[in-house]
Amino acid sequence: MQQQVEPTLKNVLENQTLKWIFVGGKGGVGKTTTSSSLATLFAKSGKRTIIISTDPAHNLSDCFDQKIGSQPTQIKGIENLSAMEIDPTVDPDKLKLPTLQGFMNDQATKSLLSELISSVPGIDEAMSFAELMNSVDEMKYDLIIFDTAPTGHTLRLLNFPNIMEKGLNKLVQLRYNFQNLASQFQGLFGSQEEFDQQMNQMFSKIETMKDTVTKVNAQMKDRNKTTFIGVCIPEFLSMYETERLVQELTKFKIDIHNIVINQVLFPDDQCKMCNARAKMQKKYLDQMIDLYDDFHVVIMPLQENEVRGIDGLKQFCELLLKPKSVPQF
C-alpha cells in the first residue's frame, strides 16, 4: 500500500517555529530511543535543545549512556543538547506557596497546604507540571522535547489545565471555609484582617500557577509551536493505544501528524520464524497506513543491537530520515 506523504520525520526538523515536542505511546515501544534520536538531530542542526523524561521509569541515562538527574545535564559528545529526568509528582513542601506566618506554626501550615492540595485529585501533578513548564520556558531553550510516560499518564498531563481550573474553584471554596473558621478562633489565627492578608498571598500564588497552566495550554494547542509524535510497534494493542492517543489529542486540539512504527521485520529467506512474524506485522502496518493516510508514518526496521550511546543513536537518527515502505511478500 502506497503512502501519501513522505514517511520520515524531515517535516518536523524543517519546522522552524516548533518549541515543544511530545513523544508518547504504549510502554516498551521505543519512545525514549525515538525522542533521544530526534533531540540529537535538532541539536546537530544548531538548535539549543533539551529532552525531558516525565516517565517514572526513566531511561534517558541508559539511552545516552551517562548519568542524568533532575537538573539539566549536558550530553557528552553532542553540542547544544541537554537532558533531565524529573519526577512528575510533587511534594507540597516544594510548591513554594507562602505560609501563614505569625498565625500557624510551620507544621500546621504544611498540614493546611497538604489538605488543600489533597482535596482535589490530580492537582498536585498539575501544579508540578505547571512549575516544570514555566521553569523550562525560562531556560530559553530553542526546543523542548518530552519523553513521556505510557499513554494513560500522558493523557492525564494533557488534561491538567481542566484539573487546575476545577481545582482552583474548589480551593476558593475551602478558602472561605478557613476564613469562617478563623473568625471563630481569632485567638489562634490572629486578627481576621491579618489572616485574610496571608490567605490572599497564598491563593495569589495558586492563581499565578493557574495562569501559567493556561499559558502552557494555549501553546500546546498552537500547531505552529507544539506537536505530538506517536510511537508504536506493529501489534494490535500498540495500534489500539495509538488510535486512542490520536483521538484524545484531537479532542484536546493538540497537533499530531507523525507516527513512528518501531521493530518492523522485513523478509528474510534464512529465517522462517522471522517471515511468519513479518507477515503478521504487515497486516497491522497496512491498517496503519490506510488509517493514517495523511500522516507521516515512519517505518523503522528492528535493530540487531540495543540502541544505546551516541553511536547507536546516530544510526537510529539516519533511519528516521530515510524513507522505508511497508515490507512486501
Swiss-Prot record:
List the catalytic residues.
Answer: D55
The residues forming the signal peptide are: none
What is the predominant subcellular site recorded for this chain? cytoplasm
UniProt keyword terms in alphabetical order: ATP-binding, Cytoplasm, Endoplasmic reticulum, Hydrolase, Metal-binding, Nucleotide-binding, Transport, Zinc
Q: Where does Zn(2+) bind?
A: C271, C274
The question of whether Signal is a record keyword is answered with no
Q: Which GO terms describe its cellular component?
A: GET complex
Tell me, in a sentence or two, what this protein's role is. ATPase required for the post-translational delivery of tail-anchored (TA) proteins to the endoplasmic reticulum. Recognizes and selectively binds the transmembrane domain of TA proteins in the cytosol. This complex then targets to the endoplasmic reticulum by membrane-bound receptors, where the tail-anchored protein is released for insertion. This process is regulated by ATP binding and hydrolysis. ATP binding drives the homodimer towards the closed dimer state, facilitating recognition of newly synthesized TA membrane proteins. ATP hydrolysis is required for insertion.
Name recorded for this polypeptide: ATPase ASNA1 homolog 1
**Which species?**
Paramecium tetraurelia
